[in-house]
Amino acid sequence: MGARDCTPLLMLSFLLFPLGFPVLGAPARLICDSRVLERYILEAREAENATMGCAEGCSFNENITVPDTKVNFYAWKRMEVQQQALEVWQGLALLSEAILRGQALLANASQPCEALRLHVDKAVSGLRSLTSLLRALGAQKEAISLPDATPSAAPLRAFTVDALSKLFRIYSNFLRGKLTLYTGEACRRGDR
């Protein structure tokens, strides 16, 4: 076996060698890197700031239902993990519906602003990514495992907004509040 015959075998072994090592930053743990969530929070804040002074084209011709982002820290700490997961999962689903509805309303506006459309598109993409990351973390399984008969399983609190700036404020607050609290605790448990 000459040197040329060994080259393909050597190259193949170099390609397969890394497969024996655990992947750092695998998707299930990616949400545990604080920089990942901080990036989504920054995008949400930028969208919120961009729409704060906006009057023209930022109001909706209908109300959009969004999750309540207020957190009672005393109650949150005493909540079962499954209840926290359910609240975050339902809130994320409702927020995704709201952003998608806002996107549709913006697309149907007479003169949609391209910058606003870009922020909404980023929010849609960000929420899809966050949903995937939470699914990999096990939030959906924890939320589903909560028995329906549990008395602590209160319905998700929600209200309506009528402007893009309010929608982005809710988006930003949800990421900084309930989502950050849940992912922080889920990552600390380390059993994922």
UniProtKB/Swiss-Prot annotation:
GO terms for molecular function: cytokine activity; erythropoietin receptor binding; hormone activity; protein kinase activator activity. PANTHER family: ERYTHROPOIETIN. Residues 1-25 form the signal peptide. Produced by kidney or liver of adult mammals and by liver of fetal or neonatal mammals. The lineage of its organism: Eukaryota, Metazoa, Chordata, Craniata, Vertebrata. Hormone involved in the regulation of erythrocyte proliferation and differentiation and the maintenance of a physiological level of circulating erythrocyte mass. Binds to EPOR leading to EPOR dimerization and JAK2 activation thereby activating specific downstream effectors, including STAT1 and STAT3. Its main location: secreted. It is found in: Secreted. This is Erythropoietin. The gene is EPO. It comes from Bos taurus (Bovine). One of its GO terms (cellular component) is cell surface. Glycans are attached at N49, N63, N108. It comes from the Eukaryota.
